[in-house]
């Protein structure tokens, strides 16, 4: 099902899961996107035995195992690790405009004003709702730092804390540099604006490189380039696509065979 970040797929999945017609497996972001929905609803099978059989407890990073674990069970098989906090740009266009990739959000805001003065109406390309949430994550990570970013989600830092409020304030100023028609654009169309020279920057995960390289036939490092999103140098904000096994899958054994494949070295190398 089309739709960035699985927005449409999740709606279709909900209909099938609640209607007693679960798919044999489905793609889901590792962590609470699955655990906080279908795992706590007792709709998924525990894959711990499969992980032991395949030796994956030793193969996957411990932090990733922790992310897909809940109440003694392991609930999905990761197939990749993405970096989300990446800023994309075209070196030739930045040279033409006389600016550099900003290293902080303050630098970004100053660069934004410079570019607006040069006639670039919206220096930051932005797409539909989930891409705006994606951007907020990178802004908040920069403002809070890794420790307080984690504290925001484990309950040690409240969203009403002045540090958290400042993240929203910075985010608001960053949005002033973005296109006003963001809600109508896919993430690919937002990337296109950078490629077409209609915007200078786009904050998107490393899958944007796949789009520009494979679909747009651009050469990485030459035609397009990247940097950590402002203020996040040395920090790798990760996310992982994974597959789980719903209870009641009609082709359960085939689904398990699929999970074995995507979790294998051969499967991981092919997928990535």
Where are these regions (language model features)?
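Conserved N-terminal structural module of periplasmic/extracytoplasmic solute-binding proteins
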Residues: 1-41, 49-58, 72, 101, ...
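Short helix-initiation/N-cap motifs at beta->coil->alpha
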Residues: 2-12, 103-110, 181-196
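Extracytoplasmic/periplasmic substrate-binding proteins
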Residues: 33-37, 135, 169-257
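Short, solvent-exposed loop/beta-turn-alpha elements that line the ligand-binding surface or hinge
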Residues: 46-60, 143-166, 214-220, 224-236
């Amino acid at each position: 099902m089309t739709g960035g970040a699985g927005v449409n797929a999740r709606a279709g999945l909900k209909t099938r899961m609640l209607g007693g017609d679960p798919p044999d497996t489905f793609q889901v972001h590792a962590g609470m996107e699955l655990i906080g929905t279908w795992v706590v609803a007792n709709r998924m099978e525990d894959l711990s035995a499969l992980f032991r059989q395949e030796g994956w407890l030793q193969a996957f990073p411990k932090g990733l195992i922790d992310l897909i674990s809940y109440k003694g069970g392991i609930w999905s098989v990761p197939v990749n690790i993405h970096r989300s906090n990446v800023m994309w740009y075209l070196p030739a266009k930045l040279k033409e405009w006389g600016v550099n990739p900003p290293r902080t959000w303050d630098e970004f805001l100053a660069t934004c004003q410079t570019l607006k003065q040069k006639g670039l109406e919206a220096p930051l390309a932005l797409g539909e709702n989930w891409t705006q949430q994606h951007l907020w994550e990178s802004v908040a990570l920069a403002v809070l730092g890794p420790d307080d970013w984690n504290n925001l989600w484990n309950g040690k830092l409240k969203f009403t804390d002045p540090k958290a409020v400042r993240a929203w304030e910075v985010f608001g100023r960053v949005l002033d540099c973005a296109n006003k028609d963001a809600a109508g654009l896919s993430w690919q169309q937002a990337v296109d604006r950078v490629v077409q020279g209609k915007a200078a920057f786009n904050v998107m995960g490393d899958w944007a490189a796949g789009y520009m390289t494979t679909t747009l036939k651009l050469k990485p490092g030459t035609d397009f380039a990247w940097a950590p999103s402002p203020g996040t140098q040395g920090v790798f904000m990760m996310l992982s696509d994974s597959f789980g096994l719903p209870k009641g899958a009609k082709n359960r054994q085939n689904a398990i065979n699929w999970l074995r494949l995507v979790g294998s070295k051969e499967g991981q190398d092919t997928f990535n």
